[in-house]
């Protein structure tokens, strides 16, 4: 997940959860959290327990996130957030708690003419390449539910649109040619191909480490004709540790109705 994608994701997340963007610029943003969002991502259970017990006025945090150290102001005091950062995974967890799927419409001001909105299915997925080590890749896809076109970096491209949860006056949605369920199947196939196109050296290296450890294990027990239970348990543990596997998890997604097309 590139840092610009992290920035765009955070911006969309906080806007969707009614958090005020107090300030933002190249490589950073300052956000005034709501009470609920503070509770979900800031790890202050004792503070909120005390506030609720004493009846004091809630004081949710205002926090600055730095998404690009090179371009953010050098004297800016904030929390660097990147793919793999604990805070970002807390936010992913909050996304799941608050609802993984949404429906949004482009905000259109019309003088009275009817405006058609085209349907897009968008998802953000995490592809995990795992053995004794793990690498995660975030993929953001958009599927046009009329033409069947699939584009990447969909989350980033959405930032050019002003979105709202309510369809605007004089707007109407175009009926999709592809049902969302069928669309997800198409996207699953796309994700599978994308995952398999990644270099396989990580898996080959894991298998080599697995073989080396199995050689050591066999050598340790080579003088024992009938292998004890410990041998088989350790053998299974090595398989669990080293066997390469790829998993895909949908983090969030939704239906997006847009006036203009999105180029790939």
Swiss-Prot record:
UniProt gene name: yqhG
Record InterPro entries: YqhG
Pfam families: YqhG
Protein name per the record: Uncharacterized protein YqhG
Taxonomic placement: Bacteria, Bacillati, Bacillota, Bacilli, Bacillales
């Amino acid at each position: 997940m590139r840092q610009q994608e992290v920035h765009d994701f955070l911006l969309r997340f906080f806007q969707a959860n009614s958090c005020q963007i107090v300030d933002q610029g190249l490589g950073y943003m300052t956000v005034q959290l709501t009470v609920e969002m503070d509770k979900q991502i800031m790890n202050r259970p004792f503070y909120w327990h005390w506030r609720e017990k004493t009846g004091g006025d809630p004081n949710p945090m205002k926090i600055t996130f730095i998404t690009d150290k090179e371009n953010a102001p050098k004297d800016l005091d904030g929390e660097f957030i990147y793919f793999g950062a604990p805070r970002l995974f807390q936010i992913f967890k909050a996304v799941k708690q608050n609802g993984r799927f949404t429906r949004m419409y482009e905000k259109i001001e019309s003088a009275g003419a009817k405006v058609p909105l085209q349907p897009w299915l968008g998802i953000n997925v995490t592809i995990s390449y795992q053995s004794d080590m793990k690498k995660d890749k975030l993929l953001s896809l958009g599927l046009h539910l009329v033409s069947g076109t699939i584009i990447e970096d969909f989350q980033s491209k959405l930032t050019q649109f002003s979105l709202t949860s309510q369809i605007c006056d004089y707007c109407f949605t175009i009926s999709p040619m592809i049902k969302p369920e069928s669309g997800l199947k198409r996207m699953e196939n796309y994700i599978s191909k994308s995952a398999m196109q990644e270099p396989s050296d990580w898996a080959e290296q894991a298998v080599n480490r697995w073989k080396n450890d199995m050689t050591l294990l066999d050598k340790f027990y080579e003088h024992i004709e009938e292998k004890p239970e410990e041998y088989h348990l350790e053998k299974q543990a090595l398989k669990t540790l080293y066997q390469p596997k790829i998993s895909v998890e949908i983090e969030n997604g939704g239906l997006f109705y847009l006036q203009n097309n999105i180029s790939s």
